[in-house]
């Protein structure tokens, strides 16, 4: 892929989960910083500034996790453009350790839109020219493994979740400090809420976690696909519903939906889980 570095940093202790690994929400936070860097390379250096008239809105994000990142791990990210149409683009971000090993790979679909109304409009000729220069391929090992990226027609709703018997795994309200400059819940905030719900998912299958289970059973995300259908704003109440969508003794797929302002996510987990069935979406 194009070796355009768009982010460099390290892992702080407070960003790690109970297993000592960088929490998935902070992977996404890094990817959003990297998106700002790539936006600058496309000629949109101020895309996320308060006064911006045009911005990039994440519509979909696929993440493949390949190697854990622990406290003080030095990391960097490169980025490029996989495809661009009239108003959208599919971008690729590769997060690497200092030794060059791939830590995670992101495919992010963004919409070129007005910052306040989120109305899509065509890319500029300058951005298209830069996109051609930044054309990239998915790095080896970063390809999707178990989650298809075909178009998805969501059925996510509170009624659908009730019909499937999905567990209540999160409730809350969007706070102003969790929103971006344009008043929308930040992308990493969606992932952080999904991550926070996972202990409740395991509790449903008899593994409540906590101090008593420390060191016994753990889980690690292998893949995510998140599709954003609407963006909650400050004051909006959220409800998260989750369930197992399939798997075996070692792997499971957790399907979650944030109701009211629906989001859809598939998460493939490594761990000891009991698979059940849930279906919130159908491929087209």
Predicted segments, located by residue:
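Hot-dog-fold acyl-thioester-processing enzymes
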Residues: 1-59, 111-223, 281-284
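Short alpha-helix capping/helix-loop boundary micro-motifs
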Residues: 61-64, 223-227
């Amino acid at each position: 892929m194009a070796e355009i570095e768009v982010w460099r940093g390290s892992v702080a202790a407070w960003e790690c989960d109970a297993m000592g690994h960088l929490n998935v929400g902070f992977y996404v936070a890094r990817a959003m910083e990297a998106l700002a860097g790539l936006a600058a390379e496309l000629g949109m250096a101020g895309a996320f500034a308060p006064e911006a008239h045009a911005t990039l809105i994440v519509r979909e994000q696929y993440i493949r996790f390949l190697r854990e990142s622990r406290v003080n791990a030095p990391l960097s990210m490169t980025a490029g453009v996989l495809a661009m149409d009239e108003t959208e683009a599919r971008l690729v971000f590769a997060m690497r350790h200092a030794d060059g090993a791939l830590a995670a790979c992101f495919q992010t679909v963004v919409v070129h839109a007005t910052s306040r109304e989120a109305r899509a409009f065509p890319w500029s000729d300058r951005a298209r020219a830069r996109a051609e220069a930044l054309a990239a391929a998915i790095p080896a090992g970063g390809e999707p493994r178990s989650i298809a990226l075909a178009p998805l027609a969501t059925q996510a709703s509170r009624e659908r979740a009730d019909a499937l018997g999905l567990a209540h795994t999160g409730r809350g309200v969007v706070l102003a400090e969790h929103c971006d400059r344009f008043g929308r819940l930040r992308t990493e905030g969606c992932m952080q809420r999904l991550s926070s719900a996972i202990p409740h998912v395991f509790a449903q299958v008899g593994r409540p976690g906590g101090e008593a289970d420390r060191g016994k059973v753990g889980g690690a995300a292998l893949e995510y696909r998140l599709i954003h259908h609407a963006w909650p704003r400050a004051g909006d109440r959220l409800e998260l519903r989750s369930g197992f969508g399939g798997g075996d003794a070692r792997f499971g797929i957790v399907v979650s939906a944030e109701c009211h302002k629906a989001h859809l996510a598939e998460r493939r987990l490594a761990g000891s889980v009991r698979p059940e069935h849930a279906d919130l979406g159908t491929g087209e």
